[in-house]
Each structure stands twice: as structure tokens, then as C-alpha cells.
Amino acid sequence: MRVCSTARNGLYSWAAQKGIPALLLERGGNGRWTSEEVEADCEDVLRLMNHLGIIKEDFKVIRQTEISKAVYEEASADGYWFPQVCAGQEVLKDALLGRWKSSDGMQNCEVRARFAGRVLYETTALGVRRNDPLVAYGTA
């Protein structure tokens, strides 16, 4: 799956904003990964190098899905996040993605999917700061 990011923070987005090609590979989650995921990342880099003409290899074609529409939900204030979905999960429109509660207990909200799609990531930490990412989902 490919996601064309519109993020304005982080080193990979800084490079892209400066016209420098950038690639962010994300596999695993919660700081955990498998040796198979590491091997897949290495193969992705080799595939990119092949595409750019840096190396010449024959790779089996893998059909990719490009996420063209994505939503990145963020915390509106410091608080607590209770995710109800996991990365990779398919969700329907209006599905409950998680619940957010402000630190002072004055604000509560349910975060629901605005459209059907696939969860790209979810924050698994309980405590979140204002503007921290909560969950992202998208569709082709």
C-alpha cells in the first residue's frame, strides 16, 4: 500500500518540501518488528533503486494499492486515547475508531470514520498531547 503524505512535520516531509525525493517505509508497530518485515523493507529499497536505474534486477511485479484519500485524526487537547481499531483493519463509514477524553474530563468524543477505508495506523499510547495523532485511515 502506498500513501502520498501531505504531512508538514518530520524529516521525510522536510526533504519532499525541499524537492528532495523521500521514502518512509513503515512496517510493524509499537516499536516491534519481525525479521520478515525487515527483509521486506530491504527488498522495497532494492526495488526503488532498480526503478531509479541504480541497480538492474528482475523483481516479480507486486500490485500496490495507492491511498488517494486519507484522514489523520488528532487530539484537540491533552487527554486520553482509547483506540477501537488496529492498523490494517478495514472499517465502514461511521465505524467507531476510538474514544478521546480530555485530561480535565470536560470533553469526550467518539472518533468515527467519515468514509469506508483501511486503518493506516493508530496511536496505542493512553496519554496524548494536543495535536498528537490518534488514528489515520484512507481509501484508494
Which residues make up each language-model segment?
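Structured catalytic-domain cores with a bias toward divalent-metal coordination
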Residues: 1-140
